Amino acid sequence: MRTPVLWLLLACLLSACTHTQQSIMTDTQRLKQLDSLAPIAAQKPHSAQYHGRTLEDPYFWLKDQEYPVVNDQDILDYLNAENAYFNRFLDPQRDLVETVFEEFKGRTDEEETSVPFVSNGYEYRWHYRAGEEYRTRSRINMATGEEQIFLDETTLAEGHKYFSLGDWDISPDNRYLAYSFDTAGDERYQARIVDLQTGEILSDKLDDVQGGLSFDASGKALVYALLEKGKWLAKNIMVHSLGDEQSQDKSIYYEADDGFFLGFGKTSSKQYFLIVASQGEVQESWVIPTKDVYAEPVQLVSREAGFSQSVDHAHGYFYILANDTHKNFRLVKVSDDDPVLENWQTMQAGSDDVYLLSLQTFDKFIALKARDKGLENIQIIDYVGGEHKVQFSEDIFSASIGVNPEFKQSFVRLDYESMITPESVFDYDIATQTLATRKVQKIPSGYDRSEYQTERIMAIARDGTQVPVSIVSKKGYKKDASQPVMLYGYGAYSATISPSFSTLRLSLLDRGFAYAIAHVRGGSMMGYQWYLDGKLKKRTNTFNDFVDVARHLVKENYVAAGNISISGRSAGGELMGAAVVQAPELWRSVTLGVPFVDVLNTMLDQSLPLTPPEWEEWGNPVTDPEAYDLLKSYAPYENIQRTNYPPMLVTGGLNDPRVTYWEPAKWTAKMRSLKTDNNLLIMRINMGAGHFANSGRYGRLKDYAEEYAFVLQAHGINE
């Protein structure tokens, strides 16, 4: 049962201060650096030649040449010095951090329980025990009523500074549990198998697992993706027979091209394993019967066809979302006897307005998530041509297909929220077309939805494009430029930041902030073309959109220039770097979470396993001088100038395989050496975690509280 790995947002930050509409934050009003000396990283000459150009990088040494091992003492000394400097900033802010943390904790249901789901005669759920960081998972035998705890994450996490459950699956005979876990944050999972009848942990030990795992139909074999030694890259889909050594495992698919990501899953019918190799806008799909896992894979779509697809299966047909004939995808079906492209039958044609996002097949219907002119909806389609949309009470919301492991169920479980509506779980009855509420997020310290308001506006970018902006604030927020705004953005890989709910965000709204999400190009809020218009040669549209959204908010009196704090993570951290370089005068503070700011050097470094697959997103500066010049022109790290910049908080993880630790470190070192202001610049590197920072729920809240304290201090708020 796939545990979604959440890699996004830091709920972002800010606080309250008054300014006139025309005011620009002056240097004397900024959050200042500490009296103690900030760490100064050594500059060591390093240059390389590309296409007749010389690339100088005096902080190249911050990448340990033995990576992923980091033992260079000079590097460790610098990172530890930055952490010590960060802690010196925190020392006088401990009361504020604790206040914010207690607010977060007060909104956390300490004994939260999931809505149970039924699978193969058992009812499954997870719950938290009060005070514990991790979940406990249990199941009830529906025939006997006997309850069994099968995964106690708190116990598994004992003795580890970091713990993350990757995936788990139960064998079809309900006897065996397989689960994967990561204790370093490097996303190289280990897998174990438990006999649920006896409680015995089998001798089977799998290392270097990508994360996902799934039993075949017999329950005697386990499918997983194997990471290459020393690289965060899977090239083999493996089958492990219970009782064997891992060295005996067999590869059922090998990906020869380092430029393709490899993954797998199981169809809702449980009849096929689906193997997908993907590179940017191109995917190749293969299927293997779950009853014969060593059978020759059957190709559904070749990479040469040059398009993306999502696949599920029911009643002898594959159902596929594909953007072969329209960028926003069409829905097709094809017999599993001969699933070649020529036999595909269109069920729903592609549309300029409706972007088809995901699907799940059931016995009697298909659930389909779509976005119509930027607004989400769930469609229900039966196998004889009938269809309708699920009706929700709000116009702007986030809805997705939830956990639905049973193929033969008469309802679809949906997850729902909006910027003012807490997370909810509904069961939608297909026959009666009614929603039954199964769960509403509990906020123990209290939440009154009527006290808050949300809206969507369109900001005009410099090229005339209308960019959607989702905004939430407390009622009474004055559009007279007197209150602050927190602006969040991402804008890459077609990922869309939906208008969702956040209990953390309330600590900003209750202090007078408006919180805005800029749905910039590079995401896919307005369709697949929205994504295409923010990548490769059009990448700078993403940065321009974000800055232009901020300027639109100033123009429309939501906020004064210089009273906007901004935040983004990963590729959103790249966006923050680009925004601060392009328009430093606009920002009150900048939070760059695990920021992908050293884009050019990373795309030049073929030793990094993620570099070749990423060329389809950013361009290949190794072979293409035009791509090199473009990346150099906008890469945030390359474009730091000798000028004034706003206060900044930078975060990273030593074991992060996605955005390596040296990117935030190099950014911080270079920024500190060039900026001409006296504003605060601090960096927090988690020395025992990766891309997703602290793994426990309270540890994460503490991280967020520290980040909020930085932002609140930047706005002059001390309580």
Features from the language model and the residues they span:
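Positively charged n-region of N-terminal signal peptides that target proteins for export
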Residues: 1-4
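Beta-propeller folds
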Residues: 7-411, 415-423, 427-432, 448, ...
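Glycine-rich His-Gly loop
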Residues: 128, 417, 488-494, 570, ...
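Alpha-helix capping and helix-loop boundary segments enriched in small/acidic/polar residues
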Residues: 165, 205-213, 228, 232, ...
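Active-site lining segments that contact anionic ligands and/or coordinate catalytic metals
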Residues: 270, 282, 308, 315, ...
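Active-site-proximal cap/loop segments of hydrolase catalytic domains
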Residues: 517-719
